[in-house]
């Protein structure tokens, strides 16, 4: 890490007195979701991140240069760093070894206002103790002050007490190995790629820190060394290399500044795509919902380009570039590091510190205007792209105004004519089904509860918005009815408070065409109405694949395995299993039972756990470049089941 950061971290003594205790650990095993969000595979990987984050905090303090993560044959994971280790003495308040306090007492750590850490991602201080509580066992080896200290825990309890194992020479740092408790987690097998993605982010965000990820499981042996001296500049280059588009200027624009104990970094580069990719972090934690640092960046970006364009005569009179205009094709990383980070939730998804907005705004305004003055050719390329986006946005605005005017003159509702609306007016109680084709839509209209279920049949070809600007979106006969029906607008006009339905359910056939429609609609929502996904409004209906029946006995199967199970249950002989080729084959009663009735249907909620991965996947699947799409299909075809081709 750079000397500037080390100086601002104000390294001071890190000893036993700086471990502060806030409360006990009793509730973690009973209510794990309160501490790690979920006991699904996402929560499982969260355990790894909690331990690694402690090592990253050592790196932020300038005390750690290398972190080794190993997935072992028994699906345990070890994390080893060369930081300072944990203070080896006794905690005066509890009369216990400090190491034991860190792993058995909730909210015990050196990150609550003492001088052990000036900047830390582990704000809530639950990491080590929660991992201990939710693991079958944890083993810790602490190297500090020339001695090696060890302790073993099982399900949060001390199994082998704290003890000194002898001298360790010059070695320093912490080794933690844990095995998640199978009675807590739905899944206990770690995914290498999931951990790799997170560790790559951490390596980019902490320039110079080496992270080595190793998988020792039989048949899966591999190792990745992550070490990026370029920091977030390398991060932007990496993102643009992942098929988001071709950069329109050679070098990544890098800006950095500080105030007090706060440091802000921004790296950005434009490509020839129509989408924006802004990824933000606070103390190395991904802030997927944005926050004050993103707001400051966007405000300054728009101001800087407008100021430059006016100063150079590119913009005349009252002409203005909007935020959407200047962000088209942008790939940007925003990373802030600060003391007393205020997040708006335990999940740390949105930063709330108002002073960070001011800091980022100031840095970007000053540094970006300097860059534009010093690089007029690059400035011209970027502004020309923004002007093209502006013209497309203006064309879209005129198309919207024309459509509204036509509706008023013709005396018709702005709701699409094909929409079979529901009676309930309170949005949170309602749902709308986006149904493939008129034939399926006809059955769907009959097989619904019209009190709260609306049906919108899709007609025409859904536009691939990955390759289109906003004016093309407003000219698409399939997307316009969706925009009208939902009522909340898109892009900069989006207002989630105007959403007319609580659930938006995509319902398409289980064939290639149906899959294509689903990905086209998801791309549209992700690019133009992303808060719908972020706030849990978008769902995928899961209609059955088979009807299994014998006489009057009927079962619906959602997989081949379930089909075989029902055939066996019904006696085998004389049982018929019919594959549904499309939604139109179901009568209204069957549609109600399998896809509409809340007590029997299956819905998949669409969520964004990793914004970078989502962005990359949509770019690969729906972008112009064929080769990365071919690679993706080749790598993921093995995961596809029950698709009619």
What are these regions (language model features)?
Residues 30-49:
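Conserved short strand/loop->alpha-helix "switch" segment adjacent to the catalytic nucleotide/phosphoryl-transfer site
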Residues 72, 79-83, 87, 506-518:
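Catalytic palm subdomain of template-directed nucleic-acid polymerases
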Residues 86-109:
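Short conserved segment of the HATPase_c
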Residues 61-63, 88-91, 445, 517:
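Conserved ATPase-coupling elements of RecA-like P-loop NTPase cores
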Residues 1-18, 25, 49, 57-59, ...:
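GHKL-family ATPase ATP-binding module
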Residues 391-411, 426-431, 442, 446-448, ...:
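C-terminal interaction appendages of subunits in large macromolecular complexes
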């Amino acid at each position: 890490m750079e000397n500037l950061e080390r100086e601002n971290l104000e390294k001071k003594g890190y000893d036993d007195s700086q471990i502060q205790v806030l409360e006990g650990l009793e509730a973690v095993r009973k209510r794990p979701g309160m501490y790690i969000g979920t006991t699904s595979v996402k929560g499982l990987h969260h355990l790894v991140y909690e331990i690694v984050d402690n090592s990253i905090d050592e790196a932020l303090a300038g005390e750690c240069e290398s972190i080794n993560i190993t997935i072992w044959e028994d699906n345990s994971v070890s994390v080893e760093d060369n930081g300072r280790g944990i203070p080896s003495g006794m905690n005066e308040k509890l009369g216990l070894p400090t190491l034991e306090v860190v792993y058995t007492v909730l909210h015990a750590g050196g990150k609550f206002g003492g001088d052990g850490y000036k900047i830390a991602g582990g704000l809530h201080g639950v990491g080590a103790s929660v991992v201990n509580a939710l693991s079958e066992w944890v083993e810790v080896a602490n190297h500090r002050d020339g001695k090696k200290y060890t302790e073993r825990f099982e399900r949060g309890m001390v199994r082998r007490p704290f003890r000194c194992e002898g001298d360790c020479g010059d070695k320093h740092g912490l080794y933690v190995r844990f095995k998640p408790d199978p009675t807590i987690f739905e899944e206990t097998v770690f995914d290498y790629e999931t951990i790799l993605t997170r560790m790559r982010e951490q390596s980019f965000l902490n320039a110079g820190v080496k992270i080595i990820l190793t998988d020792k499981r039989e048949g899966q042996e591999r190792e990745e060394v992550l070490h990026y001296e370029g920091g977030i500049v390398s991060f932007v280059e990496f993102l643009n290399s992942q098929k988001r588009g071709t950069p329109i200027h050679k070098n990544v624009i890098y800006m950095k500044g500080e105030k007090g104990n706060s440091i802000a970094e921004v790296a950005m580069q434009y490509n020839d795509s129509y989408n924006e990719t802004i990824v933000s972090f606070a103390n190395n934690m991904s802030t997927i919902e944005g926050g004050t640092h993103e707001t400051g960046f966007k405000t300054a970006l728009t101001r800087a380009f407008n100021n430059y364009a006016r100063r150079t005569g590119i913009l005349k009179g009252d002409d203005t570039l909007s935020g959407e205009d200047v962000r088209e094709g942008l790939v940007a990383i925003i990373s802030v590091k600060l003391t007393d980070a205020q997040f708006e939730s335990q999940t740390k998804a949105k930063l709330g510190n108002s002073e960070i907005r001011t800091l980022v705004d100031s840095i970007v305004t000053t540094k970006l205007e300097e860059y534009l003055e010093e690089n007029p050719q690059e400035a011209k390329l970027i502004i020309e792209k923004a002007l093209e986006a502006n013209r497309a946005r203006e064309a879209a605005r005129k198309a919207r105004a024309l459509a509204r005017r036509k509706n008023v003159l013709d005396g018709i509702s702005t709701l699409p004519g094909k929409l079979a609306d529901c009676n309930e007016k309170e949005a949170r109680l309602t749902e709308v089904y986006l149904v493939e084709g008129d034939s399926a839509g006809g059955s769907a209209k009959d097989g619904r509860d019209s009190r709260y279920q609306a049906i919108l049949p899709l007609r025409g070809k859904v536009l691939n918005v990955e390759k289109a600007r906003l004016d093309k979106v407003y000219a698409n006969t399939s997307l316009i009815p969706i925009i009208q029906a939902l009522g909340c607008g898109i892009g900069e006009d989006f207002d989630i408070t105007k959403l007319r339905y609580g659930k938006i359910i995509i319902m398409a056939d289980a064939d290639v065409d149906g899959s294509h429609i689903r990905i086209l609609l998801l791309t549209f929502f992700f690019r133009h109405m992303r808060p719908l996904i972020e706030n849990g409004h978008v769902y995928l209906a899961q209609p059955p694949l088979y009807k299994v029946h014998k006489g009057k006995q009927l079962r619906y199967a959602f997989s081949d395995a379930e089909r075989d199970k029902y055939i066996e249950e019904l006696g085998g002989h004389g049982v018929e299993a019919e594959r549904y080729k499309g939604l139109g084959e179901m009568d209204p009663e069957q549609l109600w039972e399998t896809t509409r009735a809340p007590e029997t249907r299956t819905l998949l909620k669409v969520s964004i756990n990793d914004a970078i991965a989502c962005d990359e996947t949509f770019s690969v699947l729906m972008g112009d470049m064929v080769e990365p799409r071919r690679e993706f299909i080749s790598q993921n075809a093995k995961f596809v089941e029950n698709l009619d081709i």
